[in-house]
């Protein structure tokens, strides 16, 4: 088992990661009757995509002996209606260091192969942009 999730009232859930006992709290978003005091469930999907991209980048960087510490992603989730769903996830990945063209390509292709990116429904536009310093 990966986790347990409990509805605690007031449009909030608390998830417990079984192996670490870490908690993940979600609230309904402000635009859907919520307080917006925590990630919404759909925020966790968008954030999960960015986390997966960065994790896969970290694995590849470690394998090839380069450091990408301080690489970060900015995430924007776009919702649609009828039915209410995620229609686009925009992820801007910012690298603090530049590498040669070959290493950049290796890193970018590795990131795009992350399991979350490959698991999301094809109707969700994944707009992923990589930013390298000059």
Predicted regions and their residues:
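Extended beta-strand/beta-hairpin segments
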Residues: 1-47, 55-134
């Amino acid at each position: 088992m990966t986790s347990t999730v409990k509805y605690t009232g007031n449009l909030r859930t608390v998830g417990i990661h079984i192996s670490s006992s870490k908690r993940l709290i979600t609230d309904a978003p402000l635009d859907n009757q919520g307080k917006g005091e925590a990630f919404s469930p759909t925020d966790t999907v968008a954030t999960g995509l960015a986390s997966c991209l960065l994790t896969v980048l970290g694995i590849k960087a470690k394998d090839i002996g380069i450091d990408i510490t301080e690489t970060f992603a900015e995430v924007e989730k776009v919702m649609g209606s009828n039915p209410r769903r995620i229609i686009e996830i925009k992820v801007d990945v910012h690298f603090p260091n530049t590498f040669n063209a070959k290493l950049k390509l290796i890193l970018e292709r590795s990131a795009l192969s992350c399991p979350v990116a490959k698991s999301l429904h094809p109707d969700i536009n994944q707009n992923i942009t990589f930013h390298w310093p000059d």
